[in-house]
Design a protein with these regions (language model features):
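Amide-donor transfer/coupling interface in amidating biosynthetic enzymes
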Residues: 2-15, 21, 25, 40-45, ...
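Short gly/pro/ser/thr-enriched loop/turn and capping motifs at secondary-structure boundaries
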Residues: 87-88, 106
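Flexible gly/pro-rich beta->alpha loop and the following alpha-helix that scaffold active-site loops
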Residues: 23-81, 93
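Active-site loop->helix "elbow" adjoining a glycine-rich segment at hydrolase catalytic centers
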Residues: 82-86
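Conserved active-site segments centered on acidic
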Residues: 91, 95-98
Length: 178
C-alpha cells in the first residue's frame, strides 16, 4: 500500500507537530509527503490512500489553494481529512464552512456504525472552522457543539474535525484497513 500525506502547513517547522505524528503511525507503509502548494503536478493514481493532515490555528494559507484539492474527488481510493483536511474535504463538496473554535479535549459520540470508530470517546480538537450541517456526507460522530466525523455518501472519503494522531491513532489505522 502506498500512502500520500498532504501537509497543509505553510511553515515546514509546523510539520513536526501535524505531520510527523501521522508518519509515526504509518511508518511501516510506503508513503510520500507533499505540501498542499504542489498538488497540481502530482500523479495521484499511484497512491492507495490519501491523508490530508492538519495545521496550526494561525495557518490558513491552505484556504488559498482549495481549488487544487478538487483533483482528489476523482482519486477513487480512500481519503481521510484531519482538522484542516476535514474542512478541505467539506469545501470540495460545497459544504458551508463556519467559524467554530474548539481547543482541547472534547467528548465525541458516534452517531452511526462506521469503520473508523465506535462508541463514545475523547478526542483532541484544535481548529477555528467546522461545519454546522452537511448534505453530501453522513455524520458519523458529533460533540456537544459540532460535527466531528463524516463519510461521503458516494465515495470513499472521510473527515475528522479533531486530531486522531494525538489520542485516537486507531482511527488512522482503521482508515488504512478499509
Amino acid at each position: 500500500m502506498k500512502i500520500l500525506l498532504i501537509s497543509t502547513c505553510r511553515e515546514k517547522l509546523s510539520e513536526y507537530e501535524f505531520v510527523k505524528p501521522i508518519v509515526e503511525i504509518i511508518k511501516y507503509f510506503d508513503y510520500d509527503i507533499i505540501n498542499y502548494r504542489n498538488l497540481e503536478t502530482l500523479d495521484l493514481h499511484i497512491y492507495d490512500k490519501v491523508i490530508i493532515c492538519g495545521t496550526s490555528l494561525q495557518d490558513n494559507d491552505y484556504l488559498n489553494y482549495l481549488f487544487d484539492f478538487n483533483r482528489l474527488k476523482n482519486h477513487g481510493k480512500g481519503i481521510l481529512g484531519i482538522c484542516s483536511g476535514f474542512q478541505i474535504i467539506c469545501s470540495m463538496f460545497d459544504e458551508e464552512i463556519i467559524v467554530q473554535e474548539e481547543i482541547g479535549m472534547i467528548n465525541v459520540e458516534t452517531q452511526i456504525k462506521n469503520p473508523l470508530a465506535s462508541g463514545n470517546f475523547q478526542a483532541y480538537n484544535m481548529h477555528n472552522f467546522s461545519v454546522d450541517k452537511v448534505t453530501s456526507f453522513n455524520v458519523l460522530a458529533k460533540s456537544e457543539s459540532t460535527i466531528q466525523m463524516i463519510s461521503h455518501k458516494n465515495i470513499n472519503a472521510f473527515g475528522v474535525s479533531f486530531h486522531p494522531e494525538v489520542r485516537n491513532q486507531d482511527i488512522i489505522t482503521n482508515f488504512l484497513l478499509i
